[in-house]
Amino acid sequence: MEKYILSIDQGTTSSRAILFNQKGEIAGVAQREFKQYFPQSGWVEHDANEIWTSVLAVMTEVINENDVRADQIAGIGITNQRETTVVWDKHTGRPIYHAIVWQSRQTQSICSELKQQGYEQTFRDKTGLLLDPYFAGTKVKWILDNVEGAREKAENGDLLFGTIDTWLVWKLSGKAAHITDYSNASRTLMFNIHDLEWDDELLELLTVPKNMLPEVKPSSEVYGKTIDYHFYGQEVPIAGVAGDQQAALFGQACFERGDVKNTYGTGGFMLMNTGDKAVKSESGLLTTIAYGIDGKVNYALEGSIFVSGSAIQWLRDGLRMINSAPQSESYATRVDSTEGVYVVPAFVGLGTPYWDSEARGAIFGLSRGTEKEHFIRATIESLCYQTRDVMEAMSKDSGIDVQSLRVDGGAVKNNFIMQFQADIVNTSVERPEIQETTALGAAFLAGLAVGFWESKDDIAKNWKLEEKFDPKMDEGEREKLYRGWKKAVEATQVFKTE
């Protein structure tokens, strides 16, 4: 009887369940979207119960649609949108407020106040993160400060906090397991990534009671079992957890120090495995935990690109220059270059290494001869220039020259982007056969814990290359193009509307 690992990929707009066999191949997929709530400008929220319902639905669907029995599931892995915060009543199981999503800016004033009080470096040193509304800690504080009676309940031990992984494990296990893993804990602003413990000083600054917090566990371990009424009478081990970007790093088999993956999603996320050393960044990168396994943790440097694949969506939906995302490739290849045109897609500011929230998108180098093809090519080249910005920051901070770049996300299907990426970073770009690397990473972590796979070496054999793109551009051309990009970014940062 063939066995499978069931991977739950709980994302920002949808929940997915994917079955993987022992070769790491996909045996079934189910997906369900859920509602986004925008109560005020800049606020983004989810209903945690709707997320839970969507997860139950896709788990049921993927099993039923693929004629798999529940007793064929060897283990469950969970990967999740990171930082999104749920606070719930531990007796009723009901959230006391919507889940506050990672994108939400409603805690900006809390961050600003802590910065004014001089605590930014304290948080940076202990957590590797910036004092930003992006991370979970200020979201918990906001809920406790703004929901009537919440703080009193929390202090009495009646409330629990969790990121989405914690919420799902608690529900799946029938309220038995209140846990998170090292990778998710490292995104909360409350976890000391050096001591590997919740930090009392940070909790005091955020006024968050410690009794709300989940137990922090390795990313690959049996945390509990599904309660039988959720899983066709079966008690299936819940055995692997990692935040989405860390799961993608693991799914790309980036197990060695210096291994790098880049995800081209709506935004872009690059992670470098820095081994057992937490590298302090001088270049605006985040220092974070990659995963905890085999009794130790691996650290990572992370760079964020705010606009990646969404630049192609903008060409399609905003400017209506293309009818579909794949069409961007055919337009881009109709011309030999952009003829000096640069698009800086700073629609919501610039991420790593600039961290300029006030910058806005700009276009440079237009002439009477500029055509649609040049504009489209310049827009999709911007994904690759931004990736080089982050990669150079990583090499500078870590002292490691990147030997190859493993890639995933929607834009990797575009061969033009992949080749231009290899050219502009002067490094081989490796596109895997299975591009569902986030879900695969969670499956690998769960599979290791239940003996479905024996070791990381066993897993590495399952990673298969679909295509390798080697750099073909000469050095002079590469540096000339990149100098132009740096000038364009500089000009973008100078131009600020009032």
Swiss-Prot record:
Activity regulation, short description: Activated by phosphorylation and inhibited by fructose 1,6-bisphosphate (FBP).
Segments crossing the lipid bilayer: none
EC number: 2.7.1.30
Stated role: Key enzyme in the regulation of glycerol uptake and metabolism. Catalyzes the phosphorylation of glycerol to yield sn-glycerol 3-phosphate.
Keywords: ATP-binding, Glycerol metabolism, Kinase, Nucleotide-binding, Phosphoprotein, Transferase
Source species: Staphylococcus aureus (strain MSSA476)
Reactions that this protein is recorded to catalyse: glycerol + ATP = sn-glycerol 3-phosphate + ADP + H(+)
Gene Ontology biological-process annotations: glycerol catabolic process; glycerol metabolic process; glycerol-3-phosphate metabolic process
Residues that coordinate or bind sn-glycerol 3-phosphate: 12, 82-83, 134, 244
Subunit structure: Homotetramer and homodimer (in equilibrium).
UniProt similarity note: Belongs to the FGGY kinase family.
Entry-linked InterPro entries: ATPase_NBD, Carb_kinase_FGGY, Carb_kinase_FGGY_CS, FGGY_C, FGGY_N, Glycerol_kin
The name this protein goes by in its record: Glycerol kinase
Positions bound to ATP: 12-14, 266, 309, 313, 410
Residue positions where Phosphohistidine is found in the record: 230
Binding positions (ADP): 12, 16, 266, 309, 410, 414
Cellular compartments per GO CC: cytosol
Family annotation (HAMAP family): Glycerol_kin
Pathway: Polyol metabolism; glycerol degradation via glycerol kinase pathway; sn-glycerol 3-phosphate from glycerol: step 1/1
UniProt GO molecular function: ATP binding; glycerol kinase activity
EC supergroup of this enzyme: transferase
Residues annotated to bind glycerol: 82-83, 134, 244-245
Post-translational modifications: The phosphoenolpyruvate-dependent sugar phosphotransferase system (PTS), including enzyme I, and histidine-containing protein (HPr) are required for the phosphorylation, which leads to the activation of the enzyme.
